[in-house]
């Protein structure tokens, strides 16, 4: 068996369809009913975007005329430029033939050629298999090839709508704690008058949130990068819901963001963070409740919120 690995043209519908088909099949096999799969259109938009933030590359894996897998490589261009993000998708019927191993070697060579010194990837497994995912294909594949688990997350699902009386009780409970802060919410782009303050806080998320043993560095605040991510959301047909808490001096004290996929009808919890100096004022729950209120009002069709919580907190 000889595996041919070729980079796809993101504007070639047939190649994108084949790439996405392998990705979706692998995700559904590994996660079952809990699989959260980006739509074909969402993936296509991301691959086609001309990004100043990340160099995205996607590959097809072929055995003769048969497509047996797909892979992708993400190379950050502004922050953490020592890192390469790797992803490999081999549908179950093609596993245990060395296809993933060849794909991994190819991605690692590409990463080294691009002067990257750290490779990162992710794997999913059923919760009942424990914090190490023993026996699950993804974690076992990674361990066999010298990768170690740096950070574990648990996917959770909140059915919608949330009982309004529960939100009322929470708001009443936290009212005095947040009385000195201004809470602002919006749908779509971050308003121009707060985007710089949002960006300053958002840049600390990767290092303020649990990072385990991940080799990552603090990001530099960059409004252009935020605006690029918003442009991608528009291309994907996704809708962003944002809430910010402003301190008495006008700085960003906390924020939260939900993104709704118009493809699957679900909402996804993106960043939520409270600035260290403002912790203890119930701001985390305040911005989340405000976002849920807005989500109920503006997107009543949303079926659930998916979120990811570090194992460190469980």
Where are these regions (language model features)?
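Short amphipathic alpha-helix that is part of the acyltransferase structural core
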Residues: 1-54, 62, 176-224
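Conserved catalytic-core motifs of GNAT/GCN5-like acyltransferases
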Residues: 78, 122-124, 139-143, 148-161
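A short, internal acetyl-CoA/4′-phosphopantetheine-binding micro-motif in the GNAT/acyltransferase core
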Residues: 87-95, 125, 271-280
